[in-house]
Amino acid sequence: MVPFNSAVFDPDNQFHISSALLNRKEIIKTLKNSFSPPAFPLDIMENNLNFNIMNFDTFKAAAIDFFTIEKISLCHPGGSSGYKISSNKKSIVYALDHEFGLDKDIDNSLLKIASNSDVVIWDGMYTMQEIKDKKGWGHSSIEDGVIFHKKSKAKKLFISHHAPERSDKDLDSMSKTMLPKSLR
């Protein structure tokens, strides 16, 4: 969360903010609505000169000397985008807010973009048992992540976006029972 990162308030820091889902004006509006009174105690957008907010294509072009970034549409109510970031022959795929199995074309495109990547960050909000009652909610299961990891031949799988009610103890236990030893 942007305002809970103390580095945001240091004027010597510069932040580049972009989204494949929203244009520059929409990003500014979203940040202003989320992080100003009454939802947040102060308006972080007011006089915040260390935010460089740009459209995705502008960001992609500006970053080319450091890394390449590709976007992919994901399955989530209201829309969602995933990303593949590559640099120095290494790549990471970020695929949160995605409901695996809802749209085979999107799943196949995601599999293609993640193929042989170094890391896949996966939406593991639910278990296969829990997800049965949550069709259309825009999230995946931990088990789907393991299956996707095998198919993509990615080197590592990071499960993220866990159900908020899970404790660290729950996650440790789930890791031991649901993930192959090679992924722990």
Where are these regions (language model features)?
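Cap/insert and terminal regions of metallo-dependent hydrolase folds
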Residues: 99-183
